[in-house]
Every structure is written in structure tokens, then in C-alpha cells.
Amino acid sequence: MNLITTIITITITLSAVLATISFWLPQISPDAEKLSPYECGFDPLGSARLPFSLRFFLIAILFLLFDLEIALLLPLPWGDQLNTPTLTLIWSTAVLALLTLGLIYEWTQGGLEWAE
């Protein structure tokens, strides 16, 4: 019980000291650059209707699909312990084949070409 009391006392003391120091430190004088919001390099006062690249959107959707594929295939080793592991293999192969065919179609249509 003595250890818990010591830890609580140290915690409260350290918190009080840090709070007191934060009030005593001098305030840094703000300038125009520190007061302006920074939003990923874009001018926050400009137009909010910037053109959005459709190719970037398609690449993002493909990334999400293949990320979901990994999440679906991670429990595949545990599927071997079921009563019918061949059914698990058939379903996982079907998912992989469907995603591979979709990727090939997207590639042949030129959806993965960033520059024309």
C-alpha cells in the first residue's frame, strides 16, 4: 500500500509542478504565419472547389479493394482446419481470380496509367 501512495504522490506533485511551470513561462508572441491555418500546403483562403483527379480516385478505390482482399485472405490458414478445406480453397481462389480479372481489365482499359 505504501508503494501506491508514493506513486500517487509523485504523480500529483509532478502534474502540479508542470501545470505551474506552464503558466509561468512567457507567452510566445504570435505572428501572421503562426496564426494562419496550414492545410497540406493549400491556400485555406482560396476556392474550395478545386478540380479532383478521377484517376487518383480510381487508384484509391483499387487500393481499398486490394486492402480488403488481404483482410479477407488473412484467416485462410485457419480455414484448413474446417471440415471441408477444399471449399475454403475454392472460395479463396474465386475471390483472387475475380480481383485479378478486375485488375487486368482496369490495366487494359488504361485506368492505371497516370500520365497520358
From Swiss-Prot:
InterPro entries: NADH_UbQ/plastoQ_OxRdtase_su3, NDAH_ubi_oxred_su3_sf. It is a multi-pass membrane protein. Pfam families: Oxidored_q4. Its EC number is 7.1.1.2. Coiled coil: none annotated. The keyword Nucleotidyltransferase does not apply. Keywords: Electron transport, Membrane, Mitochondrion, NAD, Respiratory chain, Translocase, Transmembrane, Transmembrane helix, Transport, Ubiquinone. One of its GO terms (molecular function) is NADH dehydrogenase (ubiquinone) activity. GO terms for cellular component: mitochondrial membrane; NADH dehydrogenase complex. It is found in: Mitochondrion membrane. It catalyses: a ubiquinone + NADH + 5 H(+)(in) = a ubiquinol + NAD(+) + 4 H(+)(out). It is an enzyme of class 7 (translocase). The chain crosses the membrane at residues 3-23, 56-76, 87-107. Belongs to the complex I subunit 3 family. Core subunit of the mitochondrial membrane respiratory chain NADH dehydrogenase (Complex I) that is believed to belong to the minimal assembly required for catalysis. Complex I functions in the transfer of electrons from NADH to the respiratory chain. The immediate electron acceptor for the enzyme is believed to be ubiquinone. This is NADH-ubiquinone oxidoreductase chain 3. It comes from Oncorhynchus gorbuscha. The gene is MT-ND3.
